[in-house]
From Swiss-Prot:
Annotated protein name in UniProt: Toxin ParE4
Its job: Toxic component of a type II toxin-antitoxin (TA) system. Its toxic effect is neutralized by coexpression with cognate antitoxin ParD4 but no other ParD or RelB antitoxin.
Entries under Pfam families matching the protein: ParE_toxin (PF05016)
Disruption outcome: No visible phenotype when deleted singly or as the parDE4 operon.
Entry keyword annotation includes Ribonucleoprotein: no
Keywords from the UniProt entry: Toxin-antitoxin system
Similarity comment text for this entry: Belongs to the RelE toxin family.
Gene3D superfamilies given in the database record: RelE-like (3.30.2310.20)
Length: 100
């Protein structure tokens, strides 16, 4: 099986930092690190199964959406693999920022 690669946009990188910092404050370092591992595993699943996320063609630009625990991973597919555009809390109004 051929596995695509994934990469993070700058905004997605910042989202991960923000999620980690908030997680440390709320739940402690160990839990924040476990949650980061969970998100990274989801990124790997997206790379292995790029169509796992539901396509949202009504958003501009169109993105795929994949849930991961309390967060939503927004990504697009291109010739280089999966670009993780944002990682947003599922309870946020993330639709307006779907494209980054």
């Amino acid at each position: 099986m051929w596995i695509m690669s994934y990469r993070l946009s700058r905004k997605a990188e910042q989202d991960l930092i923000d999620i980690y910092v908030a997680g440390v404050g709320l739940f402690g370092v160990a839990q924040a690190e476990r949650y980061q591992d969970t998100l990274e595993a989801a990124f790997g699943a997206i790379a292995a199964f790029p169509h796992i996320g539901r396509e949202r063609p009504e958003l501009r630009p169109p993105v795929r959406v994949h849930p991961c625990k309390s967060h939503i991973i927004l990504y697009v597919l291109d010739e280089r693999g999966a670009l993780i555009v944002r990682v947003r809390h599922a309870g946020e109004d993330w639709v307006g920022e779907a494209g980054g």
